[in-house]
């Protein structure tokens, strides 16, 4: 079963206003939605989140809280949500009092046990949203993010619905990969939403310059530190850097919602570099370039195609890359620049839709 981005959301005091006197929404006239909850939930759904309601209802089904008194406002609330396009995949209710010492009352895990056992929860992106400390404790027990709701937050410890949307949908696209083998020790960090401040040290000056071209023309920040067996040759350092960079880019892209996906051609002096890119989730490279020299600077020209081959393997992209010209320096640089400009188009975020009819990339 594939893991899902799931929001486990409290009801009273989070989705609807909780009456301050008896803390029970047991009549229709007591039903009132929290501010901006519907547009917030719609935006979160569009961002790929599944919605699950998780609520403690003290003594539900007893004389103090008859089932029928609960059902009328609950059904009305669900009808309102559904009429506006908000869909809850599940509604989980604990009917017990605290003193009953049941296994399902929040913050215990009884209500959400099946989600955890079935491996449905993406722990990196899922969250619990609620107005009480018990909701935050539930999040801690589930090992996922906890967000405390407050319609009028006074500090950063709690958020209203508009702030919750921003918090969950504008996470920085950052990834760091460390790759250590007998030949190399490599650290690559990328931030797809920041520019400048690149720091690249591979031990190969011209290769550093080419990686900087990718970051500069790609419009993102890159930090690369490589310690490799350059006393033998440059093969392992270049190959493993490409593998680590591809993996970092893939991780930073996340589920790829809203990205352009596709990309571009670039002239450089007498060269014409052509690059077409699809962040398809499928590795494929078609590379066409001829070099008259074995090296440009301290970079072996035979490693240029191998760099892009290794990068496409871990980035899992389809890449068509070619360049024609007479100056090997220009040919190599045009390839890296063209790839950077193409990548810039492909990773740019414009909306929340997943650019695939399959529903996954």
Swiss-Prot record:
Protein name as it appears in the record: Histidine biosynthesis bifunctional protein HisB
Family to which the UniProt record says this protein belongs: In the N-terminal section; belongs to the histidinol-phosphatase family. In the C-terminal section; belongs to the imidazoleglycerol-phosphate dehydratase family.
Chain segments carrying region Imidazoleglycerol-phosphate dehydratase: 173-361
Cofactor dependence: Mg(2+); Zn(2+)
SUPFAM superfamilies: HAD-like (SSF56784), Ribosomal protein S5 domain 2-like (SSF54211)
Gene Ontology molecular function: histidinol-phosphatase activity; imidazoleglycerol-phosphate dehydratase activity; metal ion binding
PANTHER family in the cross-refs: IMIDAZOLEGLYCEROL-PHOSPHATE DEHYDRATASE, IMIDAZOLEGLYCEROL-PHOSPHATE DEHYDRATASE HIS7
Matches recorded under HAMAP family: Bifunc_HisB, HisB
Record key words, sorted: Amino-acid biosynthesis, Cytoplasm, Histidine biosynthesis, Hydrolase, Lyase, Magnesium, Metal-binding, Multifunctional enzyme, Zinc
GO CC term (a single one): cytoplasm
Chain positions covered by the region annotation Histidinol-phosphatase: 1-172
Pfam families reported in the protein's UniProt record: IGPD, PNK3P
Pathway assignment: Amino-acid biosynthesis; L-histidine biosynthesis; L-histidine from 5-phospho-alpha-D-ribose 1-diphosphate: step 6/9; Amino-acid biosynthesis; L-histidine biosynthesis; L-histidine from 5-phospho-alpha-D-ribose 1-diphosphate: step 8/9
UniProt binding sites for Zn(2+): 94, 96, 102, 104
Cystine pairs: none
Places the protein is found: Cytoplasm
């Amino acid at each position: 079963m594939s893991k899902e981005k799931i929001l486990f959301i409290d009801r009273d005091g989070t989705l609807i206003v909780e009456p301050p006197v008896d803390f029970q929404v047991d009549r229709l006239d007591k039903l009132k939605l929290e501010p901006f909850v519907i547009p917030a939930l719609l935006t979160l759904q569009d961002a790929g989140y599944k919605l699950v309601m998780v609520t403690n209802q003290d003594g539900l089904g007893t004389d103090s809280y008859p089932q029928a008194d609960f059902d009328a406002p609950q059904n009305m609330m669900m009808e309102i949500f559904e009429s506006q396009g908000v869909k809850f995949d599940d509604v989980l209710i604990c009917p017990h009092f605290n003193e009953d010492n049941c296994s399902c009352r929040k913050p215990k895990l009884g209500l959400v046990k099946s989600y955890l056992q079935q491996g449905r929860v993406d722990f990196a992106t899922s969250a619990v949203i609620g107005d009480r400390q018990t909701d935050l404790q539930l999040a801690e027990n589930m090992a996922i993010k906890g967000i405390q709701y407050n319609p009028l937050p006074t500090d950063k410890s709690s958020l209203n619905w508009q702030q919750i949307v921003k918090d969950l949908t504008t996470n920085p696209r950052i990834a760091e990969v460390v790759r250590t083998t007998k030949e190399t020790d490599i650290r690559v960090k990328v931030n797809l939403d920041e520019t400048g401040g690149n720091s690249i040290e591979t031990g190969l000056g011209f290769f550093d310059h080419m990686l900087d071209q990718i970051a500069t023309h790609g419009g993102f920040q890159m930090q690369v530190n490589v310690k490799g067996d350059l006393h033998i040759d440059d093969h392992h350092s270049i190959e493993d850097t490409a593998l680590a960079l591809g993996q970092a880019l893939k991780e930073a892209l996340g589920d790829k919602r809203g990205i352009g996906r596709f990309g571009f051609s670039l002239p450089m002096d007498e060269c014409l570099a052509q690059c077409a890119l699809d962040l398809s989730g499928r590795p494929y490279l078609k590379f066409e370039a001829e070099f008259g020299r074995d090296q440009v600077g301290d970079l072996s020209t035979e490693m240029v195609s191998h760099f892009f081959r290794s990068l496409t393997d871990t980035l899992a992209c389809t890449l068509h890359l070619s360049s024609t010209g007479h100056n090997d320096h220009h040919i190599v640089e045009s390839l890296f620049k063209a790839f950077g400009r193409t990548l810039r188009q492909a990773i740019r975020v414009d909306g929340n839709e997943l650019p695939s009819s399959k529903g996954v990339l």
